[in-house]
């Protein structure tokens, strides 16, 4: 999986980068969805 850190406050907008708390966004190969977890 490819992981990247984005500033966000919850898993819903993890990859949008609009919030202050850093989460880790994992882009899963299958089913090609984004799963966001706390660091």
Curated annotation (Swiss-Prot):
One GO CC term on file: extracellular region
Keyword Disulfide bond among UniProt keywords: yes
Signal peptide as annotated in the record: none
Keywords: Disulfide bond, Knottin, Secreted, Toxin
Location of the protein in the cell: Secreted
Cystine residue pairs: 1-15, 8-19, 14-36, 25-32
Tissues showing expression: Expressed by the venom gland.
Gene Ontology terms, MF aspect: toxin activity
Chief location of this protein within or outside the cell: secreted
Family indicated by similarity: Belongs to the neurotoxin 13 (insecticidal toxin ABC) family. 02 (Calisoga) subfamily.
Free-text note regarding domains: The presence of a 'disulfide through disulfide knot' structurally defines this protein as a knottin.
Role this protein plays: Causes paralysis to insect larvae (H.virescens). This toxin is active only on insects.
The name this protein goes by in its record: U1-nemetoxin-Csp1b
């Amino acid at each position: 999986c490819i992981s990247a850190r984005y500033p966000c406050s919850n898993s819903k907008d993890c990859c949008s980068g609009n919030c202050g708390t850093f989460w880790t966004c994992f882009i899963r190969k299958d089913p090609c969805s984004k799963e966001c977890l706390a660091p």
